[in-house]
Amino acid sequence: MTKTGILKPKSVAETHQLMKVALGEEKADLTVVNAKVVNVYTGEILSDLGIAVKGKWIAYVGQKAGDSIGPQTEVIDAKGQTIIPGLIDGHTHIAWLFTPAEFLKYAICGGTTTVVTETLEPYFVCGYDGIIDFLESLRDQPIKFLATAPAMVSISRTAREMSLEILAKLLARDDILGLGESYWQVILQEPAQILPRFEQALAAGKTLEGHSAGAGDKKLAAYVAGGISSCHEPINAAQVLERLRMGLHIMVREGSIRRDLAEIAKIKDTGID
């Protein structure tokens, strides 16, 4: 089993250290003071807060972050600024148009700290080794890169040649979160070919990313029954609502390929939470 360590949880020692920083018994490596903080759990914007960081973990958010400041602590005065959680780009194709280095120039400036990319493109060109080389190129970057394994569900017949053995090797990696987008038409037309891949991914505790453009009502329901968890294809509020009612997580595209935000944003006027 191949592991990358990219999602390695806190150790007992790290957790104990964070507790000490939160209690003011140990000093932070970095403390941000005088900030407004967006709390995405409560929907509040809280004023005059501080954030204490130890290593790569946040230990404390509150009004007594000053207790964590020591002689070696880096202090940032964020007066007049607002801190939000880092943004996650949940679906993209890094290998399609640009290199990771070029992508980072723009992603970081927009507040993106984590990216989930498809890996279909390097597989077409170089197979399994191409995916591994691509994933290695995404390590040790200023932000976190995660990926999905090729679902091998495409309108192209040549794109359906990955064995279940290779898929299992990819799913064993902790930087592979699940299967990439799967076109609904192929799944409904060739369930015997595709559903074993879905079963394999779900058994590994991974997700199934969706591509449901053009599906609705019974066909959409049949697609969701396969275990699909998300979709980035809706282009208006009605399509978003239909998918939300079936339990899908929806991502909105706003970029060089599609600009759907204005239409989808109309859902806020429907009273839907």
What is each stretch, according to the model?
Residues 2-22, 26-27, 104-205:
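Divalent-metal coordination cores built from histidine and acidic residues
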Residues 30, 73-74, 81, 143, ...:
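A structural micro-motif
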Residues 63-64, 93, 119-122, 150-151, ...:
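Short, ordered loop/turn segments at secondary-structure junctions
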Residues 81-103:
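Di-metal (Zn2+ and/or Mg2+/Mn2+) metal-binding site signature of metallo-dependent hydrolases
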Residues 162-178, 186-273:
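Histidine/acidic residue-rich metal-binding segments in metalloenzymes
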